[in-house]
């Protein structure tokens, strides 16, 4: 089978995008692994298929490089750029992804603004925070993120209890001045550090709101810079007083992930 593909990167998070509007492609886990293999395939953190949807602008099917599925924030931004390239949308889109419906907007240049779904719980686990932004994330605060052993520590946590069975993405976050943070992420499904993780930086931005950071939070990653906008909605008791229940830190809505997405090249692969 000959596969025509487009290679994208979104702040260093790289993907193989496939126009599947005719529904001619479906892949086994072994084929997904081969396509994403950096020695024997195209090489990517994940694969995305853009498909028709009966009521929305398009349907996005995302696979991590190990064949598992999840929401990918950076991938969704790349998908919006790709859908615009294909002429499916004109600047704005509403599409279906792994965790439901999303809105996206192609701004000036290659900047894409993606609306994330609301979050409803942030669990406090010792000094860390756990939050689901379409994929589950653990936020660990460190002092020198550049020198931190992200891969061995991230792998250890990801395969430890209670995360061993389903896995978790582990984000190491350094607080910087000027409402800015630096984030490095060990991603489940890729089972390695990626240069950037969209759902991870979103989770990190929401987490640092508990430490006085305000929207929009600027995020630095090894692959580039992004920003996250959000509104915090405190939990309330029966008298309308704001409270933070044990293990929760409020809810967030109107969450937007903003950053670049670029096509790198296109080609054909014989599977």
Predicted regions and their residues:
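A glycine-rich beta-to-alpha transition motif near the start of alpha/beta enzyme domains, typified by
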Residues: 1-108, 139-242, 247-271
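Extracellular structured ligand-interaction cores
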Residues: 111
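Active-site glycine-rich loop that binds ribose-phosphate moieties when present
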Residues: 114-127, 152-157
């Amino acid at each position: 089978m000959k596969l025509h593909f487009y290679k994208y990167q979104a702040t260093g998070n790289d993907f193989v995008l496939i126009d599947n509007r005719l529904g001619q492609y479906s892949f086994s886990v072994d084929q997904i692994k081969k396509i994403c293999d950096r020695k024997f395939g195209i090489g990517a953190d994940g694969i995305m298929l853009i498909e028709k949807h009966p009521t929305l602008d398009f349907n996005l099917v995302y696979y991590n490089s190990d064949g598992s599925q999840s929401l990918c924030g950076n991938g969704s931004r790349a998908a919006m750029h790709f859908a615009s390239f294909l002429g499916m949308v004109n600047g704005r889109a509403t599409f279906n992804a792994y965790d439901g419906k999303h809105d996206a907007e192609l701004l000036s240049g290659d900047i894409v603004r993606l609306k994330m779904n609301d979050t409803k719980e942030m669990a406090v686990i010792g000094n860390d925070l756990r939050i689901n932004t379409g994929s589950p994330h653990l936020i660990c605060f460190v002092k020198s993120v550049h020198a931190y052993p992200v891969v061995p520590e991230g792998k250890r946590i990801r395969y430890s209890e209670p995360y061993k069975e389903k896995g978790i993405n582990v984000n190491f976050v350094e607080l910087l001045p000027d409402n800015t943070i630096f984030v490095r992420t060990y991603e489940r499904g890729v089972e390695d550090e990626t240069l950037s993780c969209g759902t991870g930086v979103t989770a990190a931005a929401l987490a640092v709101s508990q430490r006085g950071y305000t929207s929009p939070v600027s995020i630095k990653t090894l692959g580039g810079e992004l920003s996250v906008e959000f509104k915090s909605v405190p939990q309330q008791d029966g008298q309308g007083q704001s409270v933070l229940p044990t293990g929760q830190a409020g809810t967030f809505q109107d969450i937007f992930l903003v950053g670049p997405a670029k096509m790198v090249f296109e080609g054909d692969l014989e599977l």
